[in-house]
């Protein structure tokens, strides 16, 4: 809550600043992709406007142009219903939370439930509630320059990734399914 105003007024202020959140998220996500490219981590980009970003990256990152053309794919927007199949065919999903840093976004449980390691910036809630060995890997927004290297080392260890996937699926079934 903002000091001196009610919860309703706080919600109104947050809604007024919604586009600032969207802009900040876009800038952070672009930096993450830049770091993945610099570390030669193949990536598929889902969502809108990645084609515009990639056009700029091809101009600004000429040293990585061959890698970009071969290993960075823009897949466009997808529906929510398509996500389980996408996660099921991916080894990992890189997530950046909206600016509610005390909660969780459904991308993390959805990734884990579909056999995909979730790599995310995390939140106070996530770090408190989700054990380190549960298929979730955290990166720091304060150290975005290291995220590409971290992800590259994670995916290079195939055996460890398989273990993380198995633990993630189990954790998701235990904690986030209707079965419990």
Where are the language model's segments positioned?
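Catalytic binding pocket for nucleotide-activated donors in carbohydrate/polymer assembly enzymes
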Residues: 23, 48, 56, 61-180
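Extended, charge-rich helix/loop segments that form flexible
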Residues: 1-30, 35, 39-54
